[in-house]
Amino acid sequence: MLKKGNKLITLKGNIINFDESFYGEIMFDEKINQINRVEKKSDDFIIPGFIDLHCHGANGFDTMDGWNSIKKMTEYHLKKGTTSILPTTWTSTFDHTFEALKEFENFKKINSNILGVHLEGPFINPNKLGAQPPLAINPSIDFINKLQELAPIKVITLAPELDNMESFIEEINNHGIKIQ
C-alpha cells in the first residue's frame, strides 16, 4: 500500500475489480475512501494487489534473516504488485524461528503488508524433507503457543501422517490456524 502520512491519495486509471472495469479515480489513505467514475484521460490501470501466502523471501533476501531482509523483500514485492504477504519460515531451531517471528512482528508494527506468518515445519516428515533441513520435530502445541505470543501464525505446513498429529491438528484448528 502507498503510505504518505495522513494524506489522502488519489489515483486515476482503468479500475479493474472482480466483476467490472471502468475508468475512474480511487481516493484512499489507510483504506479506500471513495471510488468515482470519471472521464478517461490515460491508459493506466488500477488493479487489486497480489497476496503471497507462501513467501520465503525475494530478490536475495530471506524471511529468516532479520528486520533488514524483511524490509528489503517487502519493498521488492510491493514494486512487483504483491501488496500483502505471509512471510514463510523454513524448518529451523526454536530459537531461530522465535527470532524470525519477533522480527516479523516488529516490522509489521510499521508496515501493514504482513498479514501474519506461514510456519513451514518443523512438523514435517523426516523422510520427505524436500528442501527443508533435517530438523523436523514432533508436534508440540507448546511450541506453537510460544510462537503465537510473538506473531499471529495464520498457516502451518505439516505432515499429517506423523504420530500424534491428529490431536495436534485439532488443537491447531482450535487456534484458527489453517493447515497445509
PLM region spans:
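Histidine/acidic residue-rich metal-binding segments in metalloenzymes
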Residues: 6, 138-180
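A conserved glycine-rich beta-strand in the N-terminal activation segment of trypsin-fold
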Residues: 20-28
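Short amphipathic alpha-helices and their capping/turn segments at secondary-structure boundaries
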Residues: 35-43, 98-111
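Divalent metal-dependent hydrolysis catalytic cores, especially in the metallo-beta-lactamase
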Residues: 56, 71-100, 113-125, 151-161, ...
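Active-site mouth loops of central-metabolism enzymes
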Residues: 56-68, 130-138, 180
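Metal-dependent catalytic neighborhoods of phosphoester/phosphodiester hydrolases
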Residues: 62, 95-105, 130
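Generic structural signal for well-ordered alpha-helices
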Residues: 74, 98-105, 144, 169
